[in-house]
């Protein structure tokens, strides 16, 4: 990655002197372009998905609906409708509603262990969805059908080995998601996972987990990512339909306010600490004795939080909630994210992206 920073520094020095120089990849970059912002950023992720900015909104079950996904896509990113656990009619209605908000690319997420995964996979083809992200299983059974329909397939992975397997299956890109993220999590941090995955696969890698501002975006690009996925940052935007009480919990969270439940049962979930989470952790001390009670507690726990019961529900959130302090529109958030990222280090995200391309080209 030293090469990336070296090129970024060289170009910053040249641009501030209003000197033009051909980019090593053949891209002419002059002083005016330096200030045009993220709308000029082109990476393999933006090219693959046909989006303007390399920012994807994470699929949050019971939260990421047409209102949120449509707003993010319209703002230039990629909005994702979360289909996990949802009836097919709801999915159809949400995709159609999002299409009324935006004509830009739109995605949907499939949790492959869901009982209706096969029917959902076919429905998304019928609905002509642009992108499918996947989790909780292998997309092998649906890859051929999706690819034949022109759908871009992006699995979410928590390990390098899984990223390599997804590339072999034909995935167009992967989201490398660290344990800092909210919801279901793996073991590796984003800082450890992301460079390992970018070194191991040739397809584009999207960084996720612990990213909520320009610093996180710049860091992900420095580690080799060509885009980022964020969930927690979009929980408080105007277009997110969760209850105000949920949003206020995110806005007031401190860096030590999340907890991971479910590790003992093999289904770890990161959420904010509250009465419900503490009760779960206490019962998890003896799974053999309390397993049935835990199962009953989990039923409807996310729905309760989303609807406003923030004491007796699961408030899924990433650790990065500690840096989320304001309510804004999705467009305002995306514009702010890019401005912040490009203010760091005196270089544009385009320069970082191009430096990463050079690194791949040179085999570094």
Question: How does the language model describe each region?
Answer:
Residues 192-206, 212-364:
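Conserved active-site-proximal phosphate/metal-binding subdomains
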Residues 62, 77-88, 176-187, 211-244:
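Glycine-rich phosphate-binding active-site loops on the catalytic face of alpha/beta enzymes
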Residues 1-38, 363-364:
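N-terminal amphipathic/basic-hydrophobic helices that include classical n-h-c signal peptides
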Residues 1-3, 7, 148, 304, ...:
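Residue-level detector of intrinsically disordered, flexible termini
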Residues 34-204:
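Active-site entrance/lid segments in N-terminal catalytic domains of soluble metabolic enzymes
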Residues 4, 12, 42-43, 65-67, ...:
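Generic signature of intrinsically disordered, low-complexity, basic-rich segments
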